[in-house]
Amino acid sequence: MTVIFHIEGGLGKHIMATALLKVIKKHHPKDNIHVVCAYPDVFKHNTAADHVHQNGQHGAFYKQYIKGKESKTKIYFADPYTQSDFILEQKHLLSIWANQWGLKYEGETPQIYLTQSEIDYFKPFYQTDKPILAIQPNGGPQNQGFNYSWTRDIPEPVVLKVVEEFKSTHSIVHIK
């Protein structure tokens, strides 16, 4: 079976999607998984993805991977941010994302795979004995008046609680 996991959104959503890719792989362990996304480097070296394609640059994707094989193709493409459980803060976002497709989320966490040369390059910048916790509490387009979005940004009091909780055990990196 061909499995297509299509992600739209920003870098943070793509990083979060690496956890969902683990869920998809758990449900499709022997299937060929294609990730279609805006930030393909997030999925680089991720063994759960057999192929990674950048949005708008996947050419004859339909013809090559789907046409004539529709009955053996599963497509995961939906936005969890539009679900009532997310908007009303009823469940964890990854649980919502998995549940909308009937998949079971069991606490999988995001993971980025780095090569040894990438690790060696960045090592001097992050000399620490603690694990790194990268946090992107807000985002959106720069200088366009979208300074805060309740559907995207973590409220400052929550960010401060997270930082306070992890500052003694992790080196915290703020991603803008």
Regions found by a protein language model. Name each.
Residues 1-176:
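Catalytic machinery of carbohydrate-active enzymes
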